[in-house]
Amino acid sequence: NEITTEDENSNKTSDESSDKSQDENNNTGDDNKNNNSLNIQDRNCRIFFFDSNALKLKYIDTTIQVEDGAIIKALTNELQNTNHNDDFLTLTKKVSIKSATIDMSTDVLEVVFSDDYTKYMTLGTATESGLLSSLICTYAYNLGVNKVSIYFGDELYTCLRGDLPEGYFNVDYSFAEEYVKEGIDKNT
């Protein structure tokens, strides 16, 4: 009843909700010395970021490279990327994904981080909540689920809520705004 989307040993199974129109990327060998065993695909996705100046959730539609079906790892790497906008709060690079699974009986995506990212970041109430929103919205949107649980090792992360009786966060990204770089008119 579970689909494993990734694990720490890099033995991943395909995610049933993955986009079937993905194109395989031609790897030239510059990216990885062991490129013969990698399956790298380009995937269109939506990344949600918290704008720490405007205190709003924004999103960017982009294409990312996914190695061996590790979509959560690839999405997390993009959430650690500061290239989009200096005002976007990005996840520290001091943590990584240990595993990610979807429980098909409950439709809950469980994401396990290597460590507590809040230990490595200076976060206030709004920014901690905003960072959590960017994580769960990015994961949920791209995997087609609406419930996400975050773990630091085997400890359930509850953010500022103190307790999560259901064991997961319900995801709502309907209030997010599309990010448009200044000087770019999307209507042309």
Name these PLM-found stretches:
Residues 1-188:
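Bimodal "functional hotspot" detector
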